[in-house]
Amino acid sequence: EYTSLSDFYVNCQKKFVCILDRIKGKIYRYTFDGQYIEEFDCDRSVFNNVIDIHYVGENKLLLNMNNHIGTLYNYALVNESSYKLEQFLHPYPVVSRERISNGMLPTVVYGNGNIFYTVLLSDTIYTIQDGESRPIYLYEGGLKHINYEALQQETPYQSIFEAEMKLIKKGYSGGLLQLFQLKDHLYLLNSSYKCNGIHINN
């Protein structure tokens, strides 16, 4: 069956585990006790650039993507029945020349029946509602929010981290780095490495 475990996700509603095999370009489904169910071909141009995969309900997958010259978007929304791309989300404000990911940081979390996620160089927290990406919270930490005009002042950049460091020196926020969900609170770590909490209302 699969030859490489590149990533996986769990669909708790339908009770199966899905494994991404980048070598074969396939998604394999298994029951919770390891029994093979079925397999699907996946679009290599999308799935070869995935950092991690999240089931977000309503038959949708949210894919967190690498930042490099072959990937122009932070996320992709994919149909779980076909594993076909529905739309790309959140264009990267800066595209790195080398492959960079934020996959080691928890940027997608679940809480109170919702999904919350961040994008690079942004203080906005997003959610998925009715199959669409929507902003839900804006973190105000006393620094200026990065915008298009600010980014253009120092172009070109070799990487997204170079852009972040230059803008932080000018009094801009570098965006949200990590999210954690604990009970009914959402905790976030900003680019100044300060942790703050948000109470989540249903």
Label the predicted regions.
Residues 24-28, 69-77, 122-127, 194-202:
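Structural motif
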Residues 12-13, 23, 32-33, 80-81, ...:
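Short, ordered coil/turn segments that flank beta-strands lining enzyme active or ligand-binding pockets
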Residues 17, 61, 115, 186-187:
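Hydrophobic beta-strand positions that form the internal "hydrophobic ladder"
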Residues 128, 145, 149-201:
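Flexible, glycine-rich surface segments
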